[in-house]
A protein has these predicted regions:
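Glycine-rich active-site/cofactor-binding loop and its immediate structural neighborhood
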Residues: 80-123
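Short, Asp-centered acidic motifs that coordinate Mg2+ and/or phosphate
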Residues: 66, 116, 156, 205-206
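N-terminal subdomain of lithium-sensitive/metallo-dependent phosphomonoesterases centered on the IMPase/IPPase/PAP
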Residues: 1-89, 230, 238, 260-264
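Oxyanion/phosphate-interacting regions
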Residues: 1-13, 170, 174-181, 194-266
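Acidic beta-strand-loop-alpha-helix segment within the catalytic core
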Residues: 107-196, 244-266
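Short glycine/threonine-rich catalytic loop with a Thr-x-Gly-x-Asp
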Residues: 95-98, 186-189, 218
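Generic detector of well-ordered alpha-helical packing
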Residues: 48, 71, 88-91, 95, ...
Length: 266
């Protein structure tokens, strides 16, 4: 059993509290599917409630740290060196439709470097955690390791599509086609943080998506790296995918191949 640090314990407590609230609300959402209006407003309230619970719990643990959160944005802390990056509900569309594939994502950044990451899927009760230089774990006790597969033809690769209003749909379709040609096991599950956790767990060999937000990827970046995986910016190897939101996560075995295939579509 790995020893859990005090910081990670605070994150786990916050995630478990938010999870209880989200699980209750997810039960309601399943009932609301039949109504004509749908559960849209109800889900945004659920999302905000979860964010508030996480905020309170993290604040109690570390009163001086700042925050970057999906719903309420940036809160400066009195200590400028530390910042929590939080997505209270990643995979919102799944949640809204009663599809049990969504999660909570919490990361800690210290002086601009990711030091702690947690991704929690409470429906499957799978918690993925990592601490910098301390490895990545599932359910707090089993070490995570990226997959050893090296053959694109036998790989499982996940992606996410850009939204019509903000994304380059043509580019996405070119990338999708190019990857599908060499790797038939393509998936699109709709929760970027979980996609990254699954790369870390060796379930997919790779995941790529563009225009994500920092809270979608912060925890996942650290978890993938600590599981022995590679993270890259899709267009500029010097840029930080946490800032640009264009991310490729992969095991070592297919990293250069998938990068080449994606680049060939530019
Ligand atoms: P969300 O559920 O928190 O909105 C789906 O492709 C994944 O992308 C989800 O993790 C979703 O997070 C995230 N996402 C967030 N903003 C997005 C955007 N503007 N366009 C596409 N996907 C976005
Ligand atoms: Ca998200």
């Amino acid at each position: 059993m790995a020893v859990t640090s005090p910081i990670l314990n605070v994150m786990i407590k916050a995630a478990e509290k938010a999870a209880r609230s989200l699980i209750r609300d997810f039960g309601e959402v399943e009932q609301l599917q039949v109504s004509q209006k749908g559960p849209g407003d109800f889900v945004s309230a659920a999302d905000k409630r979860a964010e508030e619970l996480i905020f309170e719990e993290l604040k109690k643990g570390q009163p001086t740290y700042g925050f970057l959160m999906e719903e309420s944005g940036e809160h400066a802390g009195s200590n400028p060196d530390f910042r929590w990056i939080v997505d209270p509900l990643d995979g919102t569309t799944n949640f809204l439709h009663g599809i049990p594939h969504w999660c909570i994502s919490i990361a800690l950044e210290a002086r601009g470097e990711l030091t702690h990451g947690l991704i929690y899927d409470p429906v499957k009760d799978e918690m993925f955690t990592a601490e910098k230089n301390g490895g990545a774990f599932i359910r707090r006790n089993k070490r995570l390791r990226v997959s050893g597969r090296q053959d694109m033809m036998r790989a499982t690769i996940a992606t996410g599509a850009p939204r019509r209003a903000t994304g380059d749909q043509e580019r996405f379709l070119r990338e999708y086609t190019a990857v599908l040609n060499v790797s038939p096991g393509l998936r699109r599950f709709g929760a970027a943080a979980l996609d990254l956790a699954y790369v870390a767990a060796g379930r997919y060999e790779a995941f790529w998506e563009r225009k994500l937000q920092p809270w979608d990827v912060a925890a996942g970046i650290l978890i993938v790296k600590e599981a022995g995986g590679f993270i890259a910016e899709l267009d500029d190897h010097k840029a930080n995918p946490l800032e640009t939101g264009n991310i490729l996560a992969s095991n070592e075995g297919i990293f250069s191949d998938i990068k080449k295939v994606l680049k060939s579509t530019a």
